[in-house]
Amino acid sequence: VYNFIDDNPGVLMMDVGYTNDPYVISQNDRFVAINSALQVDLTGQVCADSLGTKFWSGVGGQIDFVYGASLSKGGKAIIAMPSITNKGVSKICPTLLDGAGVVTTRNHIHWFVTEFGAVDLYGKTLQERARLLISIAHPSAQEELDRAAFERWGSHHHYIKGYMK
C-alpha cells in the first residue's frame, strides 16, 4: 500500500485536521454522513463509543462528519443501526446508560435508520422525536419505550401503542 501511495499523483493524503474539519466537509454540497451508534435515547442523543462506563471505541470523527453534513447545502446526517443487539437488547432506550457519553447531540441528527424504517428527527420536538424513534424500534421494545415516553412527557402526546391515543 505504501509503495502505491508514495509519489502517486492520483492519491492525496491529508492530515485528519483537514479531512475531519466540518467546514471542509460542508463545502461538498449534498454531503451525506452515515454513522452508527451503540445506543440512542428517546430524545435522539447518540452514544457511539461506550455502553455506560465500558468503552468500546474512540469517538473518531462522527461528530465532525455529522456537523459537516448538517452545514452542507442539501446535506444529511444519518445514524443507522440495528434496533437490537445480538442479545436482544434494544439499542433505542428511554435514556442512555449511566456513564455513557453523548458523541452526537440530538440537535445534529437528521435521519435515524433501523431495519424497521427511517425517520427524520431534524427540527422535531423532544416528544415528536420519541414518537418517531419508537416507531422504528424493535417491536419487542416498543411498549416499554412507549411507557417511558408517557411517564416522561405525560398525556399531551400520542405514542405508538398509546397510553394516550
Question: How would you name each of these model-derived features?
Answer:
Residues 1-165:
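Conserved phosphate- and dinucleotide-binding cores of soluble alpha/beta proteins
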